Curated annotation (Swiss-Prot):
Disulfide bonds: none annotated. This is ATP synthase epsilon chain. It is a peripheral membrane protein. Residues 112-136 are annotated as: Disordered. Its main location: membrane. InterPro entries: ATP_synth_F1_dsu/esu (IPR001469), ATP_synth_F1_dsu/esu_N (IPR020546), ATP_synth_F1_esu_C (IPR020547), ATPsynth_dsu/esu_N (IPR036771). Keywords: ATP synthesis, CF(1), Hydrogen ion transport, Ion transport, Membrane, Thylakoid, Transport. One of its GO terms (molecular function) is ATP binding. Pfam families: ATP-synt_DE (PF00401), ATP-synt_DE_N (PF02823). Produces ATP from ADP in the presence of a proton gradient across the membrane.
Amino acid sequence: MSLTLRVLAPDKSVFDDTVEEVILPSTTGLLGILPGHISMVTAIDIGVLKLRSSNGNWDSIALMGGFAEVESDDVTVLVNAAELGKSIDKATAEKEFEQAKAALNKLEDQAGNSADKLKAKESLNKARARSQAVGE
């Protein structure tokens, strides 16, 4: 048995194929999906989706938040943005992660606008997801 996984962003279909297993970064923690999983809808956090293909290899997709629906061995993930781990340049992702971390540290040392700090934390989370997806 297998699952049909679709990862859709507003501007493109990121992934559409059959897989053996999916691990989703839900807002309440990692969520493993295998064939026969109960139907559900869950919120997706910024993080890394892991999928095991029929050949047993694991691949990663960086997700930038959204929702996932599981129904009858179909997993549909609707996200704000997504990127296949194998298409991310490792050096660029690591550089962006370090820059985001430095920007957040600079803001946390200052008293001031919490909206800027929230944006910096979100940027750090996105950069971390991209960096982790490429390293998987």
